Amino acid sequence: MVAEVQKQAPPFKKTAVVDGIFEEISLEKYKGKYVVLAFVPLAFSFVCPTEIVAFSDAAKKFEDQGAQVLFASTDSEYSLLAWTNLPRKDGGLGPVKVPLLADKNHSLSRDYGVLIEKEGIALRGLFIIDPKGIIRHITINDLSVGRNVNEALRLVEGFQWTDKNGTVLPCNWTPGAATIKPDVKDSKEYFKNANN
């Protein structure tokens, strides 16, 4: 099974570092919630801690939207635990509020299409999975550029809005902004107001 937008997310069960201990984490555990699954290439590297720390610091915002952030790496759970024990000022993570999944056999990275086989590391994939287990969004960055927490949160809020209200969202939409009724006639209301 390969991850695709509008398809069921590949299931997984992995050992994770959660609040300083090891815990088995599965996608099934979060059924009924949105899941933001993000992959990082390597523990103790450079861009990765900035991403995990930023998403961890924003964990409450995602929780308030009924979403759980998960990070996955091809490192072992022991490496990930050691990384959380290293202070942030030294390039570590310190305590984090998001589970860190150990994908040491690379099955998760492979199933989600982010594994660089030759190097045994993952590209910076970000997947938004809805409460029914359907993938709604995929982005995959090269190794050198980190992701944007606010954009990930905006996408979760956007998918939730469209699911609830049946409207579609224009470019650069933010919560509270105008939406579009997906109908040839009714959509004209949006375009009339947007182009005055």
UniProtKB/Swiss-Prot annotation:
Keyword flag Disulfide bond: yes
Signal peptide: none
Modified sites of kind Phosphothreonine: T174
InterPro entries attached to this UniProt entry: AhpC/TSA, Peroxiredoxin, Peroxiredoxin_AhpC-typ, Peroxiredoxin_C, Thioredoxin-like_sf, Thioredoxin_domain
Pfam families, A to Z: 1-cysPrx_C, AhpC-TSA
Compartment list: Cytoplasm
Reaction catalysed by this enzyme: a hydroperoxide + [thioredoxin]-dithiol = an alcohol + [thioredoxin]-disulfide + H2O
GO MF entry, a single one: thioredoxin peroxidase activity
Main location: cytoplasm
UniProt-listed Enzyme Commission number(s): 1.11.1.24
Cellular component annotations (GO), alphabetically ordered: cytoplasm; cytosol
Active site residues of this protein: C48
GO terms under biological process: cell redox homeostasis; cellular response to heat; cellular response to oxidative stress; hydrogen peroxide catabolic process; protein folding; protein stabilization; response to oxidative stress
Residues annotated as domain Thioredoxin: 3-161
Keywords, sorted A to Z: Antioxidant, Cytoplasm, Disulfide bond, Isopeptide bond, Oxidoreductase, Peroxidase, Phosphoprotein, Redox-active center, Ubl conjugation
Keyword Magnesium attributed: no
Crosslinked residue numbers (Glycyl lysine isopeptide (Lys-Gly) (interchain with G-Cter in ubiquitin)): K14, K89, K132
Enzyme type, top EC level: oxidoreductase
Top-rank taxon: Eukaryota
Induction: By peroxides.
Oligomer status and interactors: Homodimer; disulfide-linked, upon oxidation.
Function: Thiol-specific peroxidase that catalyzes the reduction of hydrogen peroxide and organic hydroperoxides to water and alcohols, respectively. Plays a role in cell protection against oxidative stress by detoxifying peroxides and as sensor of hydrogen peroxide-mediated signaling events. Can act alternatively as peroxidase and molecular chaperone. Oxidative stress and heat shock exposure cause a reversible shift of the protein structure from low MW species to high MW complexes, triggering a peroxidase-to-chaperone functional switch.
Misc. remarks from the entry: The active site is a conserved redox-active cysteine residue, the peroxidatic cysteine (C(P)), which makes the nucleophilic attack on the peroxide substrate. The peroxide oxidizes the C(P)-SH to cysteine sulfenic acid (C(P)-SOH), which then reacts with another cysteine residue, the resolving cysteine (C(R)), to form a disulfide bridge. The disulfide is subsequently reduced by an appropriate electron donor to complete the catalytic cycle. In this typical 2-Cys peroxiredoxin, C(R) is provided by the other dimeric subunit to form an intersubunit disulfide.
PANTHER family: PEROXIREDOXIN 4, THIOREDOXIN PEROXIDASE
Protein family according to the UniProt entry: Belongs to the peroxiredoxin family. AhpC/Prx1 subfamily.
This protein's name: Peroxiredoxin TSA2
Organism expressing this protein natively: Saccharomyces cerevisiae (strain ATCC 204508 / S288c) (Baker's yeast)
